[in-house]
Regions:
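Export/targeting segments at the very N-terminus of extracytoplasmic proteins
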Residues: 3-6, 10-15, 19-64
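Generic preference for well-ordered secondary structure
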Residues: 37-41, 72, 103
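Catalytic and binding regions of secreted/periplasmic enzymes and modules that target cell-wall glycans
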Residues: 52-53, 81-143
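Secretory-pathway/luminal and periplasmic proteins that interact with or process carbohydrate-rich
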Residues: 61-68, 126-131
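Short, surface-exposed loop/helix-turn segments at secondary-structure junctions
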Residues: 68-74
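Short glycine-biased active-site loop of nucleotidyltransferases that positions the nucleotide triphosphate
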Residues: 77-78
Length: 143
């Protein structure tokens, strides 16, 4: 059996370097996620948050900026929609994001940079209100 030539601490870090999302991304998804992360940096996301943001974006939308998830009640009626990269819920957040000056209409959440700005505001909202940073994505993130 061949032993690793890397010291155990370095080996452990190298195994952590690939996020869960990156491990399961198709090449096309990886290109989309790379683009999303580039845009996230442009709109003010901190470098330390980018690996987990990538995980969230891949998990929520497969890094598709025009992704729409429909939430339905027990009769099948659509009650709300989750929009864009970060799948921001229109029913929960449109009014707040309008009041913050981030969007003018719900459909603005389908614009890549706007969606990422809105997601950053939701992360900041969580921190301001004493929640875990990634609280808005707790159903998917496992955090």
């Amino acid at each position: 059996m061949r032993k690793s030539i890397l010291p155990p601490a370095i080996l452990a870090l190298s195994l952590l370097a690939t996020s869960p999302a990156e491990a399961s991304e198709t090449p096309q998804e990886a290109r989309r996620c790379d683009r999303a992360i580039q845009l996230a940096r442009e709109v003010g996301w901190l470098k330390k948050d980018l690996p987990y943001l990538r995980y969230i974006l891949h998990r929520e939308s497969r890094c598709q900026p025009d992704s729409i998830g429909r939430n339905r009640d027990i009769t099948g009626k659509v009650t709300s929609e989750d929009l864009g990269y970060a799948q921001i819920n229109d029913r929960s957040w449109v009014t707040y994001l309008k009041n913050q000056g981030i969007i003018r209409t719900r459909d603005d959440l389908l614009k890549p940079k706007t969606n990422l700005k809105a997601a950053l505001e939701l992360l900041r909202y969580s921190v301001r209100h004493g929640y875990d940073r990634w609280h808005q994505w707790r159903g998917t993130s496992g955090k």
